[in-house]
């Protein structure tokens, strides 16, 4: 039954709707300005500036929401507006969105503002956008001077080499390329290596998204090759090879490789999108099966991703019958974790009390999760979705889980009819706990898991992250086989840690003691002491000493800390180094290096 008013007679309703849309437009203008600035920072190789920009953009949305809430309360006494006017506000807002180019994001912004003002009993489709109201299908900017979502190129006309060069140069990056002809030849060789020689169908064409995707020290060209009924995805990272010179680093031609660079464990891209739904639809064609929620999140629209995820959860609950259960595995000291077996995510709640030796607070743990949200995750830390007042049907909660919730988090529970409302929780992608992966894996899987674990910790170290608790249970293995850290309550900046060697024992009593014979400060870390906790399994030990024998040497950790203190930002690649053109086709680089020996020496370094 439709409860909406027949007439839109409230001037306040229209004014409130217009004010809300103005604040959304301000938010999205800032969002796009950040992407434009990212291009300038990339061209100048200002990596610290790019990091700062990415951090600031994450908080921008909440700042605009709060500004909007304050204006509505001050100017319209929003909390006193009656139900009929609130319904008119939504209808007026829908009317304002009919020709908008980001309607889905504007609807999410409306929800964010309303959830700050209205009681949760209003969180239904009469008052907020539980379901979308404006279609984004075939949405484009039709203005003559507008940049299209993607450009189409036809290699059959000018040849593949000329077409690829045009694709790159159309982005009009300011620094020149070291040797673009060489890089184009590498792209063509990689395509041949991957697909062999294929016959060009009449519809042979290349589609390329019109904006670059910026993250870390790379700018990605993203597109697809169309040939007959085949859709072949690709991404080309552009990097600085030395001051003032660019190069194409590789071409990624497999869906699994693109899914990794767009994964939940990486920081968000900075990309300029006039019509974000069109970009997301394009990306869905090259990564089918990847949820739209994750794609919106990966391109920096994390609130839209969060909204879509919640809709996906509600849809899944209405089309499934299994129950939420306590997550299998070793229980954590600070988090209660549960899951729905048919849904590939875990739900994490901070406990009311923490047993010794944990010395922390709810506020401190929330700050750690916020630190990770704002930090460069490098594909090694899981992103989290944070929710408040989540209502779950009691009939879908396992009795053992309800008992566990009532025992561990009673302050966060509220019974409301047939639902249990959880006042605060985090949601993450479900992964295989690394301890179980190593325990149950084949010899090859154990070696892979250990190698990945060492790589993950070393990369986090270089990114100024000390995990704190190094146990395998705090790491997970993704469906792509990457090891990712996901337990953040003890996380610290490496530069805040004091890397120490274990002092030699003073006597035999010290040597036999089960307790440290030396003082340990709150920020002291002793890499030499990690061995007994990590190397108990003979298979794990053999793999660890094969791939990461230096892991327990304090010098490794101190060297990373020293470089960070000197302001150095190391290079990170979300793909295997063997895929880089300079590694894969070294003979093509020799001619360039022979013409400029200093370049070759710099690349080798």
Swiss-Prot record:
Instruction: Say what the protein does.
Output: Bifunctional enzyme which can phosphorylate or dephosphorylate isocitrate dehydrogenase (IDH) on a specific serine residue. This is a regulatory mechanism which enables bacteria to bypass the Krebs cycle via the glyoxylate shunt in response to the source of carbon. When bacteria are grown on glucose, IDH is fully active and unphosphorylated, but when grown on acetate or ethanol, the activity of IDH declines drastically concomitant with its phosphorylation.
Q: Which UniProt keywords apply?
A: ATP-binding, Cytoplasm, Glyoxylate bypass, Hydrolase, Kinase, Nucleotide-binding, Protein phosphatase, Serine/threonine-protein kinase, Transferase, Tricarboxylic acid cycle
Q: Which organism is it from?
A: Burkholderia multivorans (strain ATCC 17616 / 249)
- In short, the EC number is 2.7.11.5, 3.1.3.-
Q: Which residues form the active site?
A: 383
Protein name according to UniProt? Isocitrate dehydrogenase kinase/phosphatase
* Family recorded in the similarity comment: Belongs to the AceK family.
User: What Pfam families does the database record attribute to this sequence?
Assistant: AceK_kinase (PF06315), AceK_regulatory (PF20423)
The entry's localization annotation reads: Cytoplasm
The catalysed reaction is: L-seryl-[isocitrate dehydrogenase] + ATP = O-phospho-L-seryl-[isocitrate dehydrogenase] + ADP + H(+)
Fetch the NCBIfam families from UniProt: PRK02946.1
Binding residue positions for ATP: 327-333, 348
Query: Annotated Gene Ontology MF terms?
Result: [isocitrate dehydrogenase (NADP+)] kinase activity; AMP binding; ATP binding; phosphoprotein phosphatase activity; protein serine/threonine kinase activity
Q: Name one GO cellular component term.
A: cytoplasm
Q: Which GO terms describe its biological process?
A: glucose metabolic process; glyoxylate cycle; tricarboxylic acid cycle
């Amino acid at each position: 039954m439709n409860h909406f008013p027949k007439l839109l007679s409230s001037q306040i309703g229209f004014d409130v709707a217009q004010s809300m849309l103005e604040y959304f437009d301000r938010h999205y203008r800032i969002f796009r300005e950040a992407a434009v600035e990212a291009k300038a920072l990339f061209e100048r190789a200002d990596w610290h500036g790019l990091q700062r920009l990415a951090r600031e953009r994450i908080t921008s949305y909440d700042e605009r929401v709060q500004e909007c809430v304050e204006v509505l309360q001050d100017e319209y006494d929003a909390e006193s507006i009656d139900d009929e006017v609130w319904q008119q506000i939504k209808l007026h807002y829908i009317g304002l969105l009919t020709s908008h180019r980001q309607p889905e994001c504007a609807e999410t912004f409306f929800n964010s503002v309303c959830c700050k003002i209205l009681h949760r009993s209003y969180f239904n489709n009469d008052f907020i956008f539980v379901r979308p109201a404006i279609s984004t299908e075939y949405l484009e900017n039709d203005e003559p001077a507008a940049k299209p979502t993607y450009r189409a190129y036809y290699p059959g006309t000018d040849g593949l080499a000329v077409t690829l060069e045009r694709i790159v140069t159309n982005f009009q990056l300011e620094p020149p390329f070291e040797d673009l002809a060489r890089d184009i030849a590498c792209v063509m060789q990689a395509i041949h290596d991957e697909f062999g020689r294929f016959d060009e169908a009449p519809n042979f064409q290349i589609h390329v998204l019109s904006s670059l995707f910026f993250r870390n020290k790379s700018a990605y060209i993203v597109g697809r090759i169309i040939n007959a009924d085949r859709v072949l995805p690709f991404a080309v990272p552009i990097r600085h090879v030395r001051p003032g010179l660019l190069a194409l680093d590789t071409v990624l031609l497999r869906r699994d490789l693109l899914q990794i660079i767009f994964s939940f464990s990486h920081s968000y891209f900075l990309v300029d999108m006039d019509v974000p739904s069109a970009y997301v639809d394009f990306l869905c064609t090259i990564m089918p099966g990847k949820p739209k929620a994750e794609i919106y999140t990966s391109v920096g629209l994390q609130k839209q991703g969060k909204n879509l995820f919640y809709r996906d959860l509600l849809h899944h609950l209405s089309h499934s019958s299994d129950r939420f259960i306590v997550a299998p595995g070793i229980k954590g000291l600070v988090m209660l974790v549960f899951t729905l077996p048919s849904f590939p995510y875990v739900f994490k709640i901070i406990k009311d009390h923490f047993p010794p030796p944990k010395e922390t607070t709810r506020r401190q743990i929330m700050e750690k999760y916020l630190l990770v949200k704002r930090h460069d995750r490098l594909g090694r830390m899981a992103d989290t979705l944070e929710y408040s007042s989540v209502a779950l049907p009691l009939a879908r909660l396992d009795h053992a889980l309800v008992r566990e919730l009532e025992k561990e988090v009673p302050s966060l529970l509220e019974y409301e009819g047939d639902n249990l409302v959880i006042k605060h929780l985090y949601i993450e992608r479900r992964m295989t706990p690394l301890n179980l992966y190593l325990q149950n894996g084949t010899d090859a899987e154990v070696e892979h898991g250990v190698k990945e674990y060492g790589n993950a910790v070393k990369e986090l170290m270089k990114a100024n992250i000390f995990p704190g608790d190094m146990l395998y249970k705090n790491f997970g293995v993704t469906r792509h086989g990457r090891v990712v850290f996901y337990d953040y309550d003890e996380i610290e900046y490496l530069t805040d840690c004091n890397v120490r060697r274990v002092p030699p024992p003073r006597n035999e009593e010290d040597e036999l003691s089960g307790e440290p014979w030396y003082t340990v400060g709150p920020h002291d870390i002793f890499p030499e002491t990690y061995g007994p906790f990590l190397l108990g399994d003979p298979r794990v030990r053999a793999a660890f000493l094969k791939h990461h024998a230096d892991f327990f040497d304090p010098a490794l950790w101190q060297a990373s800390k020293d470089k960070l203190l000197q302001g150095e930002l190391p290079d990170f690649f979300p793909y295997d180094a063997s895929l880089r053109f300079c590694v894969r086709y070294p003979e093509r680089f020799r001619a360039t290096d022979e013409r400029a020996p200093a370049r070759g020496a710099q690349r080798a370094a």
